[in-house]
Amino acid sequence: MDDINNHLSLRKVIYTDESLLFNWANDPDVRKWSFSKNIISLDEHKIWFNKKLNNSNVLMLIFEVNNTPAGMVRLEKENGEVVLNYLIASQSRGKGLASRMLKMAMNEVKNHWQSFKVLAYTLPGNIASTKSLEKAGFLLSETDTRKNFLVYNFADQ
């Protein structure tokens, strides 16, 4: 049975997730499709992680399939908008989880912050991400050719 048919749950990121997120962030495929291609040092990650975890305008969620971590969504509220970032663990890719995670995350935005414009940025060649965003209800709203990224808006607003 594929993971897609199994139980997908979410929880807030906690301090003990620091090394998990560090490893996920430095996965070669994650770095390939990130705006910054540089490997993240452990010291950089610790500073970033503590800053995000202690910020009331940041909501970080771990998604689990049958209690095994499968991905993360980070939502950051700023200037009346929420910016979405996400990644899928290498062993969980290609199973249709991303769009399900994104839909669940949008429900969390509504529960956590009521109504906000949600934006997602992706690189033009990241077909898996664009398909997942579109399947989750995001619409392409802008192409920034200077910075080479696509901007998606969540359509259910």
Regions found by a protein language model. Name each.
Residues Y15-F22, L42, K46, N50:
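An amphipathic alpha-helix signature
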Residues D27-V30, I39, N54, R93:
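Residue-level marker of structural boundaries
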